[in-house]
């Protein structure tokens, strides 16, 4: 039993749209509250200027999460605001500040806020590092990241790759812990109900590609894999449907052209919009398999969702993806090539589905929120 500690979490949260980090931060705050640690989230009034945001809207249309104290106050591009917010948190004297780091663009803002907090000589600053070296790199990344890291006391990562990247910048205390399961998207629904909600064929094998669509996530590789299946195994292709669920974060035309040129329109169902929290369960429960054909990755928020909803996975052997999906047990691991992905798609439907589900239910016991909070409190 830990002594009661006051906690501030700095990072995305409501009214910013759900998505990995907002959902994670809100669930983490709830866990600390369940363990009797007073917790407040400080989130962004402006996270990205519109010209830097590739989606349609940064803000949620859903109801505010119940029972959470969320201060909407950080402006990522206003240095006067950074000092004001840093001094406000400094005066609160929280025992622990937990700050998310995922993009060097945020380093000046977050690094300045942390320097202000540090002056109270009381608060321990712990960073949950989603990325240290971003997927798409720029020349400013290293100096910005160094600026952010300096006031941080300790780090938590959710993949070995991020931990190794961190070691290129600092030898401060750091530990790796598994990404806990998202269990705040509601209970599972029946496959029939889920497929009806989405409006898809209930007789076909359903593969789900879920999340924001960006180059590193390899959707183009998946589309080439579906073309290979059509050419080599037309009977299997006719039983297949691929649901693309998520908002484009780059040029949509690149993908729609691929679908048309590969003549696979009849197998692709596009739900290319932002998927709200209340809709998530329907997509995962409708799917027979969740696929992550990523070119590169650190960790993924899709894997914990698949575990939560007991959905088998196909992942590529990049970053931490493979280490979180035991091959042949809860899904398949393949190479990030169209040929390897096509083979994995054909193979997974030959495996015993009930055995995969049983293995998932056993494997997901490792992904605990209490383990995650314990790790933070022990740093």
Predicted regions and their residues:
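Conserved acidic donor-binding segment of nucleotide-sugar-dependent glycosyltransferases
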Residues: 327-339, 345-352
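Acidic donor-binding loop of glycosyltransferase active sites
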Residues: 282-298, 311
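Short hydrophobic beta-strand element within catalytic cores of glycosyltransferases
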Residues: 306, 312-315
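N-terminal strand-loop element at the rim of the active site
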Residues: 11-18, 30-87, 91, 162-163, ...
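Conserved donor-binding/catalytic core segment of Leloir-type glycosyltransferases
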Residues: 201-217, 223-226, 243
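Nucleotide-activated donor-binding/catalytic signature segment of Leloir-type glycosyltransferases, i.e.
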Residues: 253-278
């Amino acid at each position: 039993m830990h002594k009661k500690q006051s906690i501030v979490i700095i990072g995305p949260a409501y009214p910013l749209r759900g998505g990995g980090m907002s959902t994670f931060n809100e669930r983490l705050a709830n866990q600390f509250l369940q363990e009797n640690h007073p917790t407040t989230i400080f989130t962004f009034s402006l996270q990205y200027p519109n010209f830097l945001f590739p989606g349609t809207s940064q803000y949620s249309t859903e109801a505010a999460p119940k029972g959470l104290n969320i201060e909407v106050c950080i402006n990522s591009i206003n240095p006067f605001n950074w000092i004001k917010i840093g001094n406000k948190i400094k005066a609160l004297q929280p025992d622990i500040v937990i700050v998310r780091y995922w993009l060097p663009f945020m380093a000046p803002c977050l690094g300045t806020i942390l320097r202000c907090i540090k002056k109270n000589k009381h608060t321990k600053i712990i960073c949950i590092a989603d990325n240290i070296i971003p997927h798409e790199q720029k020349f400013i990344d290293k100096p910005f990241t160094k600026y952010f890291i300096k006031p941080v006391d300790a780090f938590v990562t959710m993949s070995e790759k991020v931990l190794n990247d961190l070691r290129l910048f600092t030898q401060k205390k750091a530990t790796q812990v598994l990404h806990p399961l998202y269990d705040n998207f509601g209970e599972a629904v029946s496959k029939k109900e889920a497929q009806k909600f989405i409006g898809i064929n209930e007789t076909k094998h359903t593969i789900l590609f879920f999340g924001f669509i960006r180059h590193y996530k390899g959707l183009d590789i998946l589309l080439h894999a579906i073309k290979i299946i059509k050419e080599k195994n037309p009977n299997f292709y006719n039983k297949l449907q691929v649901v693309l669920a998520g908002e484009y974060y780059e040029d949509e035309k690149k993908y729609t052209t691929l679908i048309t040129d590969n003549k696979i329109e009849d197998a692709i169902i596009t739900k290319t919009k932002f998927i709200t929290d209340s809709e998530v369960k329907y997509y995962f429960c409708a799917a027979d398999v969740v696929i992550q054909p990523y070119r590169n990755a650190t960790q993924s928020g899709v894997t914990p969702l698949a575990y939560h909803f007991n959905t088998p996975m196909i992942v590529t052997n990049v970053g931490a993806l493979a280490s979180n999906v035991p091959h042949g047990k809860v899904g398949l691991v393949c190479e990030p090539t169209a040929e390897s992905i096509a083979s994995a798609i054909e193979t997974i439907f030959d495996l015993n589905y009930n055995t995969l589900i049983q293995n998932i239910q056993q494997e997901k016991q490792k992904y605990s929120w209490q383990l995650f909070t314990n790790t933070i409190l022990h740093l």
